[in-house]
């Protein structure tokens, strides 16, 4: 085990605070509508230019071990806030730096760090309650667009795209962000349920122009095993043919004689069918087949439920208004399932989401909810160059997270105003002793900091603006983009409540840990091993011609 360097008390804290300041100073220049850019070096290709706080934070790694510890702790604030709320990373970093800076002064003057932390926690809890009171629900398209625009660094086109996507697929729908092929942003919406499996034979295509098979008002047969024997399918095929409607077969696989017979019937026009493989694998495949069954009002024909293919009737088949099957995707539009059953299934999956431990599982479950509840929208980001594309895509993803947070917990006036209002409301808060009161004071001072930084980045005098905003009421604040004092909500400068709340809580949590640190242990730098000597002498004369 390598030797360690152990540093105590003020020496440890001072070094860690230096690291906090280096990281925070690099991140905070990006805050607000007039925030500056930060250029990040790349090991290959051109540098990346960004105004995204968390991207800057993730790049920073310091040489000094103790400084790096401090920087990594604040980096944790940014990433945690990004994970929970999707935005507010720069605000959280600014708050953490302020709490650490003010707190260190009190610790240096001999106050008890534990009492300071108790005071900080008390003030944060009161401020969070106050933010919830100020918050108002975010329901209209206009409000959603405003939140998206602010989060994407005042880019209204991104806000509009996200609002349009949410309008099309609902608040629960899946919205994904991809690289576009043109200069303009595009929005593709898939209504109904889509899964990534296409037709098993191109002979099923009945729309050669689009290269898809379209089934109008079809039955849907769901089976969890392979189908290779046509005899198993015959009874149900005869019933469907009598009904004079097309059929979609979704099974683990359809092969051999069964597939050949279906293709021949299709070509001759006897029975219009399309066969596709079931989506997913293992347990997820079973669950997705069950989802499709509930959406179409049918049943999965499986041995576990006591159903067999030979005995299947039309009652066990699902139905839909229209189904489109392409080479790689199948889309079921307007399934005949009961709304009550679909809602119950969505509720059940939501419970699984809450219990899920891995991000991958959670993401897949959320996709299933969206497919049942709404639809899928894809925002294709357009840009002139690769560098611009990456930067814009990161902003769109941030904005998307922020709008989801706004729909979830509502919105508050932006531009640092909500924290100023919450600060005014809790100004009379007191602790049980002078040290706790100092902790409360630290938070009250920190809550001004985001507004100060926004104003400073805009090149104005921060103290004057903070005093003017604090003297106002309600949504009255400073719009740094125009340099005017306005009603922030009317001007469209709003933040999701969840983002502001999470930023404050995470900043206080990590800053409190830093203030109560009394020793730091870091690995000592390894001394370079001496270079090996040259080859030993006396190698000549070994009978070789040199």
Curated annotation (Swiss-Prot):
Entry's EC annotation: 5.6.1.7
InterPro entries noted in UniProt: Chaperonin_Cpn60_CS, Cpn60/GroEL, Cpn60/GroEL/TCP-1, GroEL-like_apical_dom_sf, GROEL-like_equatorial_sf, TCP-1-like_intermed_sf
Residue stretches in coiled coil: none
Key words, A-Z: ATP-binding, Chaperone, Cytoplasm, Isomerase, Nucleotide-binding
Annotated segments matching region Disordered: 526-546
GO molecular function: ATP binding; ATP-dependent protein folding chaperone; isomerase activity; unfolded protein binding
CDD domains referenced in this protein's UniProt entry, alphabetically: GroEL (cd03344)
Reaction(s) catalysed (UniProt annotation): ATP + H2O + a folded polypeptide = ADP + phosphate + an unfolded polypeptide
Enzyme class: isomerase
Keyword match Chaperone: yes
Subunit and partners: Forms a cylinder of 14 subunits composed of two heptameric rings stacked back-to-back. Interacts with the co-chaperonin GroES.
Family: Belongs to the chaperonin (HSP60) family.
Name this protein carries in UniProt: Chaperonin GroEL 1
